[in-house]
Regions:
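Long, well-ordered core segments of solenoidal/helical folds
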Residues: 4-23, 64-81
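Short linear capping/connector segments at secondary-structure termini
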Residues: 23-31
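CBM-like carbohydrate-recognition segments
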Residues: 34-35, 39-124
Length: 124
């Protein structure tokens, strides 16, 4: 129950940080940072699963998910590569470190979360 409550709090807080383009920034709590697609896809996946499991309110989260998914597929090129994927990152308390990270189009750790989303959408 405690884990589910933490999950709901996280999903609720993500609502406040969704950027105008529909996705989330490299620093989630700063909408001025560049859009990061792999993390955004993970958030979409978590929201879709939450709605389908009955943990999240569909009327609240479906519009966010729809906006994010439409934005996310706009980052997939003709070869199926996804842009805006942050290179592998260790953790630090230095915000600038995260802002200076490079993006790697086609990076496989960006592909997987998008495939998770597709799978979640297709599940009944």
């Amino acid at each position: 129950e405690r884990i589910l409550e933490s999950y709901r709090r996280m999903m609720n807080s993500l609502r406040d940080y969704q950027k105008e383009d529909g996705l989330w920034g490299q620093l989630v709590d700063d909408k001025t940072t560049w859009t990061e697609t792999s993390g955004s896809a993970m958030f979409v996946y978590a929201m879709v699963k939450g709605v389908k499991k009955g943990w999240l309110d569909e009327a609240t989260y479906a519009p966010l998910v729809r906006k994010a998914w439409i934005a996310l597929i706009g980052h997939i090129d003709e070869n199926g590569d996804i842009d805006g994927v942050c290179e592998g990152t260790n953790k630090t308390n230095d915000r600038q470190f995260y802002l200076n990270r490079k993006t790697l189009p086609g990076n496989m750790h960006g592909q997987a979360p998008v495939l998770w989303c597709v799978n979640a959408f297709l599940e009944k």
